[in-house]
A protein has these predicted regions:
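Catalytic core of pol beta-like nucleotidyltransferases
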Residues: 1-38, 47-52, 62-122
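Glycine-rich beta-strand-to-loop/alpha-helix junction loops that act as flexible
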Residues: 42-44
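Short beta-strand->loop micro-motif that forms the acidic, two-metal-ion catalytic signature
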Residues: 57-61
Length: 122
């Protein structure tokens, strides 16, 4: 899994909890700039019990003609400095489906249990 952190801020024990409103606003920023098919929140903020040190984990479903790593970097670089860490994964729908069909437990869990924050056309 390739991720990139947009974190610029305090140590985890000094951070405050991140509201869903803040997370949705972040997803909307990404959606406006990159027009993804979907943005899915996963990890402790989606299906766990986040604490003050929890990061925000996002799967951005979109075509990645420049490659997944470059796409992740472009998304991360577009974000303003944040007081929390954001881990972004960018995958095309075809890649997600192919990986799920080949037994990728991680992507199965993310697409099954994650919270869709943005869906194009909805």
């Amino acid at each position: 899994m390739v991720t990139r952190s947009a974190f610029q801020g305090q140590e985890p024990e000094k951070r405050t909890r991140i509201s869903m409103r803040t997370i949705r606003a972040l997803a909307n920023q990404i959606a406006e700039k990159f027009d993804p098919e979907e943005i899915i929140l996963f990890g402790s903020h989606a299906y766990g019990k986040p604490d003050a040190g929890s990061d925000v984990d996002l799967l951005v479903v979109m075509e990645t003609p420049k490659g997944e790593v470059k796409t992740i970097m472009e998304i991360s670089d577009s974000l303003p400095p944040l007081p929390f860490r954001v881990d972004i994964i960018a995958r095309s729908r075809a890649t997600i489906n192919r990986r799920k069909n080949s037994g990728d437990f991680f992507l199965r869990e993310v697409t099954k249990r994650g919270k869709v924050l943005y869906a194009r056309g909805h």
